[in-house]
Structures are given as C-alpha cells and as structure tokens.
Curated annotation (Swiss-Prot):
It comes from the Bacteria. It catalyses: (2R)-3-phosphoglycerate + ATP = (2R)-3-phospho-glyceroyl phosphate + ADP. Its main location: cytoplasm. One of its GO terms (molecular function) is phosphoglycerate kinase activity. This is Phosphoglycerate kinase.
Length: 399
C-alpha cells in the first residue's frame, strides 16, 4: 500500500511539524558522540527548507524518569549540531509547550528552522508523551499545518509525538527516511528478489522468535549464528558446554527447525573460550565436540565458509544480529566475514542491515557505504521484520 510522502504535499509557507529521531548518544560533557541519526534526517530537512517550509522539529532523547534527567537529555546540543550541518540557524526553544514556543512558531518565516525540547520531558507529568495523552497530541498538532513523520526509530511506539499528532491533523505524510525504511524492509518482506537470505544473530532466541517465524515464510535461507544458535544446537541433541542456552525455548527451537524444512542453517563449528573474556584461550570446535568447560562465542571457519557460499548467490539479504561477540577481537571474525561477504554484494544485490548491534558492527568495520540500507531503528526494524503493523507507519496517509 503506497504511502504519501513529503514530496506529495505543498510546503511553501506551511508550518511543518516534523517528528525526527534525534535520540543520539551523548558524552558526559553533553557533546554528541555519534550524529548518525541527525545526518540520516538531513535529506528530509533540507527538502523542506528548499521548498519554503516553516520547519518545526522535535524528538525524544533518552529516558526521563526524574527531574534530574532533564539536565543530561536536552536537545540543545542537537540543535547546535544540526545548525552546523545545514549551515543555517536553528532556533531552539527549551520548552515542550507554552507561550514562548507558540510565539516562536508564529514568528517563523519560509525556510526557517525551529526545534523544541525533548518530547519525553512530558513524561515527568504522568507519562504524557509515552502514553499518547490525547490533549498533548492535540496541542502539538495545533502548532502546525501538516505533519511529517520521519522517525522510524520510534515507529513501533504509539506516542503523543507521532500517533497523537497524526490523529489531530488532516495531512500526515512520511519523510524521506521513513519512506526509505518502508521501501527497503517492506519491499524485502513483500516482494524480494530471490534468492532471499536472512541472517540472524544476537544472544537470545526469545528476542527473535516472531522474526524467525515470519522470515521462514518468505526467505529461501535463514542463517543463524550468535548466542541464539546454541539453543537450536541443544534442541538437535548437541552438547554445547557453557554456551548460552534458553532451556525453556528448546521445544520451540525444535518446532522452528521442523517448520523450516531445511531453510535454517546453523553451520558446522564454533570458536570457543573457557570464559566470557577477551583474553581467554580460544579453540575451534565442531558442533559434536564442544567440551563441558567451554562456551561458543563466535561462528567457526567452516560455518563462515558455508554462510559466505550462501550469501554469494543472494539477491536480497536482511541481516539482524551479530554472529559472535564482535566487541572482543578474538570473537569478531564471524561477524567481520559476514559483513565483508555482504559488502561484496554491493551493486549486485539488495543488502539491508536491521539496526542495533549489526549496524554497530558495520560501522566498526567501516563498511557502511557498501550496504543498500542500514536501518535507523533497532526495535522498530525488528517488529517490522516480525510482520507487525507499526503505529508510526500506519498513521501516514495512503495515496
């Protein structure tokens, strides 16, 4: 179902409310340690400016549980960074509502940019943002003529700053970043070019059950590494030593393996250590030879070779979750090799990284520009891959 985007509406002299995801990591001194989420929103912001919008930006930042949290989670440094990136002033209003904000909005001229304070400051008073307080959504909606949602990172949440505003606006459209997320992830699930390979990793099966079930319906192969692989191995009768296993998920793992009809591939071997430690002694063990006092912390060389062979022929790949403890050098090889294999598909296949740790791994290895799409939403991309309807996508008008 085609969604309306910012390109489909008139912006000149319109007050444009734009929900962005500027939930960036901050250093102790308040400076921004990674501005990826800001740069990801630039195409939409610059498009709106170019078309003569009066732009009103807002986002959440961190979690606000006490009044003290406000001091360390202000969007002020974000506004300053955005101003540097777009080369024009960004008026920052340190409020989430009130006369100062209303007056500043009224004073905006075509091409001006304003940002107001962290939407979650409203959570100090009865979680108004996170619980989608109807009055708050209505108030924010009253500040603008049209609503643009460009925050995929919060698309799986129904908050006042997305769904609440949309419920009170005649026009709600997707920004260019949200459009890209819908096109890439939605396209992979609905109409993938084949072979379609899904690569899953991370620690727990329980985090990815629905993703596995949904991907088994559409993918040609599902490669599973990381900690979650050991629950599947245990379910097949292998002894996995001290490796991470979810005992309460063994029956489910068996069920998924049967359901997969050979689509799930776990490989052949693992890299083990005696402890979860960067200095532990490592060994390569086949699945049937993992000692009781060792734990698997990365996929082994034969598994790497098998995964690379499958990836090489793929036309669509979705990757969510590292293959090992890539933060430790001794257990980074599996994730590195998978990243490189996907980078080698550049220009030959669609490669999608589902946010979170996988995106961090791609960044660590410096291969971001070799991927078709790196999702800006961890939880949102996971729920999208589960086949769920995301509130922040559903609110967008249909063409």
């Amino acid at each position: 179902m085609a969604k309306k985007t910012i390109r489909d509406i008139e912006l000149k002299n319109k007050s444009v409310l734009m929900r962005v995801d500027f939930n960036v990591p901050l250093n102790k001194d308040g400076s921004i340690s990674d501005d990826t989420r800001i740069t990801a929103a630039l195409p939409t912001i610059e498009y709106a400016i170019e078309k003569g919008a009066k732009l009103i930006l807002f986002s959440h930042l961190g979690r606000i549980k006490t009044a003290e949290d406000k001091a360390t989670n202000s969007l002020k440094p974000v506004a300053a960074r955005l101003s540097e990136l777009i080369g024009r002033p960004v008026v920052f209003i340190p409020e989430t509502r009130g006369e100062a904000l209303e007056a500043a909005v009224k004073n905006l001229k075509s091409g001006d940019v304003l940002m107001f304070e962290n939407t979650r400051f409203e959570d100090l008073d009865g979680n108004k943002e996170s619980k989608n307080n109807p009055e708050l959504g209505k108030y924010w909606a009253s500040l603008g003529d049209v609503f643009v949602n460009d925050a995929f990172g919060t698309a799986h949440r129904a908050h006042a700053s997305n769904v609440g505003i949309a419920n009170n606006m005649e026009v709600s459209v997707a920004g260019l970043l949200l459009e890209k997320e819908i096109n890439f992830i939605g396209g992979a699930l609905e109409n993938p070019e084949r072979p379609f390979v899904a690569i899953l990793g991370g620690a727990k099966v329980s985090d990815k059950i629905e993703v596995i079930k949904n991907l088994l319906k559409v993918a040609d192969k599902v490669l599973i590494g990381g900690g979650m692989a050991f629950t599947f191995l245990k379910a097949q009768g292998f002894e996995v030593g001290k490796s991470l296993v979810e005992l309460d998920k063994l029956d489910l793992a068996k069920e998924l393996l049967e359901l997969s009809k050979g689509k799930i591939e776990l490989g052949f071997d693992v890299v083990t250590g005696k402890a979860f430690d960067k200095d532990t002694e490592t060994n390569v063990r086949s699945f049937d030879a993992i000692p009781a006092d060792e734990m698997g912390l990365d996929i082994g060389p034969k598994t790497v070779a098998r995964f690379k062979e499958i990836i090489a022929s793929a036309k669509t790949v979705v990757w969510n979750g590292p293959q090992g403890v890539f933060e430790m050098e001794k257990f980074a090889n599996g994730t590195l090799e998978v990243t490189k294999a996907l980078a080698d598909l550049h220009g030959k296949a669609i490669t999608i990284v589902g946010g979170g740790d996988s995106a961090a791994a791609v960044a660590k290895f410096g291969l971001e520009d070799k991927f078709s799409h790196i999702s800006t939403g961890g939880g949102a991309s996971l729920e999208y891959l589960e086949g769920k309807v995301l509130p922040g996508v559903e609110l967008v008008d249909v063409i």
